[in-house]
Amino acid sequence: MEWDTVIGLEVHAQLKTKSKLFSGASTAFGATPNSQTSFIDAGLPGVLPVLNEQAIIMAIQFGLAIHGTINDLSVFERKNYFYPDLPKGYQISQYQKPIVTNGYLNIQLGNNLEKTVHIARAHLEEDAGKSLHDAHTDYTGIDLNRAGTPLLEIVTTPCLYSAEEAVNYLKTLHQLVRFLGICDGNMQEGSFRCDVNLSIKPKGSSVLGTRTELKNLNSFRFIEKAIAFEQARHQDILERGLSVIQETRLYNPDNNTTQAMRGKENENDYRYFPDPDLLPIDIDKEQIEEIKNNLPDLPEAIYKELKNTPSLNDEDINFILSSPDTYQYYKKIKSLCPAADKTIINWLKGQYAAFLNEHNLTFETPPISAKTMAAFLSKIHEKKISSSIAKNIFSMLCAGEEDIDAIIEREGYQQQNDNSALEEIVEQIIKQYPEQVIEYKAGKEKLLAFFIGQAMKQTKGKANPEQINLLLKKHLG
């Protein structure tokens, strides 16, 4: 029997606020356990939550970016369940009236195919604390530093049908929240976590199967593997005439399996009710319009713009959109030397990216300012310096020098354009390599690059390669 896989995703994006959702405690990662915990986070009696306005603004930004509906009235509710790292005995979340509903995100599937992923809702909630099982051998520790950190939970409809589509959507969403500046997207630190809801059904059937939830996946590779395993597990169960149990499961990357964690709860199990300590959020249209007018450049619009740039291919575009900092750096350079598109991207994703990787740097704090890099790339594009000399100058710029003209003057890097002098060099090379000349004339045209290389070597990279190319073709016939 053939089967269809149906997937819905819930993403928890940690918002980049300096303080928590309902307290003034810091959200900085990696602090000493329980050093960033307020009375509210610890669930002590007699304290009241105070809503972080910045989290509301970030949620609205996201809602606008996914073309969603920003609800003018939004309500916080208590989600009741017991867990050791949830000291209040409930989580403040949103259920009946979330802040964002009915949005969508377009994803690129290759071969110029596009798919629209429907986002049912995005709501605010506080994160729970963390259980530390490995810190002690005879008991589990509780760290409440994360408790109360603002999360935006982003929930799709069950409209994804393969691991490839799911991961593609997650990468697109990950890119969006980083470009919006609302989430750093650091999956290793848990800033961007995903729950996968998966079921399978007979091919063509309109009736969904029993779903399982894969909890807290924080790696695109693990998500892909977990989905593949769970698909196969469901299929094996059903083809043996058994029933899939609705439950929450954990993915174990060590042996590439999933294992049961607990029975999957339904909404009624959480006994949601409006939090009496928090007023409903009233969002007016003027506030939404102001936020909309201040949205940054978004990846989908940037992609379409870059796609219309003839000199850029998909690999170039993906590199430019790999991070907001990369895009902003590229954008600044492009504005200063607009004609040098291909030169810019070749250097950024080639020599420059290699240097950054080697020195564990990013475009967030580039060693060369955009202004200096633009001046440098302009000289390459205008053929004022050769590629070999450009590499030497680039190393000096990375070391902190900024005045390119001063470097060229000091090092004697001025390009040699004297036609008669270059012609003399070409004649010498042709006399020096008679066998290669015979081979070239016999049809081995690739040897032209050899002759150009010899000319560049003799001039220490100062010769104009285009002039050398023309002179060689003239003399070689």
Swiss-Prot record:
Domain of life (superkingdom): Bacteria
EC nos: 6.3.5.-
HAMAP family, sorted: GatB
Function: Allows the formation of correctly charged Asn-tRNA(Asn) or Gln-tRNA(Gln) through the transamidation of misacylated Asp-tRNA(Asn) or Glu-tRNA(Gln) in organisms which lack either or both of asparaginyl-tRNA or glutaminyl-tRNA synthetases. The reaction takes place in the presence of glutamine and ATP through an activated phospho-Asp-tRNA(Asn) or phospho-Glu-tRNA(Gln).
GO molecular function terms listed in the Swiss-Prot or TrEMBL record: asparaginyl-tRNA synthase (glutamine-hydrolyzing) activity; ATP binding; glutaminyl-tRNA synthase (glutamine-hydrolyzing) activity
Pfam families per the UniProt record, alphabetical: GatB_N, GatB_Yqey
Protein name stated in the entry: Aspartyl/glutamyl-tRNA(Asn/Gln) amidotransferase subunit B
Gene: gatB
Quaternary context: Heterotrimer of A, B and C subunits.
InterPro entries hit by this protein: Asn/Gln-tRNA_amidoTrfase_suB/E, Asn/Gln-tRNA_Trfase_suB/E_cat, Asn/Gln_amidotransferase, Asn/Gln_tRNA_amidoTrase-B-like, GatB, GatB_Yqey_C_2, Gln-tRNA_amidoTrfase_suB_CS, Gln_synth/guanido_kin_cat_dom
Catalytic activity as recorded in UniProt: L-glutamyl-tRNA(Gln) + L-glutamine + ATP + H2O = L-glutaminyl-tRNA(Gln) + L-glutamate + ADP + phosphate + H(+); L-aspartyl-tRNA(Asn) + L-glutamine + ATP + H2O = L-asparaginyl-tRNA(Asn) + L-glutamate + ADP + phosphate + 2 H(+)
Species: Legionella pneumophila (strain Paris)
Keyword terms: ATP-binding, Ligase, Nucleotide-binding, Protein biosynthesis
